[in-house]
């Protein structure tokens, strides 16, 4: 019997009536009664997600900036000030995606940074950090003592500030992809995985339950992994292991914007493989699919286009659109606005759309 890991919020989940499930070895809420209600709370009001299974790693050393310029495909030289965040792929030598992560610059001297990476990939991420880090003499401090809570939705910040009014100036000054150290191991960033405004709060594990319950009392809806998935799907955001993996290039997964090739003198892990793929030509591209009626789109369904076959990588019923949606990879030279998907052996018509489907509560297509 495998003992599941628990987060600092575990007691709060139990007290809130969560249905707990195994997610990558962690016991986490799938919902607290109604996945649909939780989804709608984030689109119209405020919801919160325990994301403490994600790994926070503090990196320090005189060569920390050079280390990150080698480690990831995006370039930390763009982090112009303390607290600025950068989204990037972490690549292997073949140009496949080990993980996607966020890096924060945490001091003026560019000698300290913070990584937030996915929970399901923490072992291979950590192995890659250490492998690349050897030549740079940097230190790694995995912050197992911290919890992390995403507070998301159009009223998320308003409700957060009823609990933490002293944060008002800091939080109101944060633009998307900026974070701030609030002292005593509290950190807040204007980031998220829902397509709505909001923040992610990193905090001491010992203070997690009290913070969760205070937000709950302020009207923030606890949300589980089910709503997290439907929200990120509507927002057209990739899920590691579905929409990209060790054998998928970021250029094939809608992540080309996270690859920075401007500084030709910078070498990073996977760069040679990416350049070779660009030279050869990327065979597929990422699109969104919208099913007209009947059936549900799921991962690994065959997509039929006039330029050849593709495949869905994620699929779900969208609570906001009341239709089934999918993220898919299709032939690069396909530019039609309709295709077909095989559902239980039968062809179903789908619209082909540019991602995202929904952003800030609004449908993004006609």
Swiss-Prot record:
Keywords carried by this UniProt record: Aminotransferase, Transferase
Catalysis performed (reactions): N(6)-[(R)-S(8)-aminomethyldihydrolipoyl]-L-lysyl-[protein] + (6S)-5,6,7,8-tetrahydrofolate = N(6)-[(R)-dihydrolipoyl]-L-lysyl-[protein] + (6R)-5,10-methylene-5,6,7,8-tetrahydrofolate + NH4(+)
Record SUPFAM superfamilies: Aminomethyltransferase beta-barrel domain, Folate-binding domain
Record-listed E.C. numbers: 2.1.2.10
Top-level taxonomic group: Bacteria
Single GO molecular function: aminomethyltransferase activity
GO biological process: glycine decarboxylation via glycine cleavage system
Cellular compartments per GO CC: cytosol; glycine cleavage complex
InterPro entries noted in UniProt: GCS_T (IPR006223), GCS_T_bac (IPR022903), GCST_C (IPR013977), GCV_T_N (IPR006222), GcvT/YgfZ/DmdA (IPR028896), GcvT/YgfZ_C (IPR029043), TrmE/GcvT_dom1 (IPR027266)
NCBIfam families linked to this entry: gcvT, PRK00389.1
Record note on quaternary structure: The glycine cleavage system is composed of four proteins: P, T, L and H.
Protein family per UniProt: Belongs to the GcvT family.
Role played: The glycine cleavage system catalyzes the degradation of glycine.
The protein's name in its UniProt record: Aminomethyltransferase
Originating organism: Neisseria meningitidis serogroup A / serotype 4A (strain DSM 15465 / Z2491)
Lineage: Bacteria, Pseudomonadati, Pseudomonadota, Betaproteobacteria, Neisseriales
């Amino acid at each position: 019997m495998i003992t599941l890991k628990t987060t600092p919020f575990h007691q709060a989940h139990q007290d809130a009536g969560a249905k707990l499930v195994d997610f990558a070895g962690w016991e986490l809420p799938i919902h607290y009664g109604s996945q649909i209600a939780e989804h709608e709370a984030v689109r119209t009001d405020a919801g919160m997600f325990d994301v403490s299974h994600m790994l926070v790693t503090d990196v320090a050393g005189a060569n920390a900036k050079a280390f990150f310029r080698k480690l990831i495909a995006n370039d930390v030289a763009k982090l112009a000030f303390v607290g600025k965040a950068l989204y990037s792929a972490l690549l292997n030598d073949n140009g496949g995606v080990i993980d996607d992560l966020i890096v924060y610059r945490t001091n003026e001297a560019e000698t300290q940074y913070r990584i937030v990476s996915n929970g399901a990939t923490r072992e291979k991420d950590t192995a890659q950090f250490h492998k690349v880090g050897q030549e740079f003499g940097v230190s790694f401090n995995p912050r197992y003592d911290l919890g992390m809570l995403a507070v998301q939705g159009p009223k998320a910040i308003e409700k957060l500030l009823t609990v933490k009014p002293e944060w008002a100036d800091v939080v109101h000054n944060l633009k998307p992809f900026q974070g701030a150290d609030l002292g005593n191991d509290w950190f807040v960033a204007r980031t998220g995985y829902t397509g709505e405004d909001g923040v992610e709060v990193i905090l001491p594990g010992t203070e997690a339950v009290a913070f969760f319950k205070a937000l709950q009392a302020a009207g923030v809806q606890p949300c589980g992994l089910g709503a997290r998935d439907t929200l990120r799907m509507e927002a057209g955001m990739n899920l590691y292991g579905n929409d990209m993996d060790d054998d998928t290039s970021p250029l094939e997964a809608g992540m080309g914007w996270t690859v920075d090739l401007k500084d030709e003198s910078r070498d990073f892990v996977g760069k040679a493989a990416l350049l070779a793929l660009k030279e050869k030509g990327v065979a597929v591209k990422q699109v969104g699919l919208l099913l007209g009626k009947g059936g549900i789109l799921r991962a690994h369904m065959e997509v039929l286009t006039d330029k050849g076959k593709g495949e869905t990588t994620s699929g779900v019923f969208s609570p906001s659109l009341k239709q089934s949606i999918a993220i898919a990879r299709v032939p690069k030279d396909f530019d039609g606005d309709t295709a077909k998907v095989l559902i239980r052996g039968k062809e179903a018509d789908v619209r082909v759309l540019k991602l995202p489907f929904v952003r800030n509560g609004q449908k993004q297509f006609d």
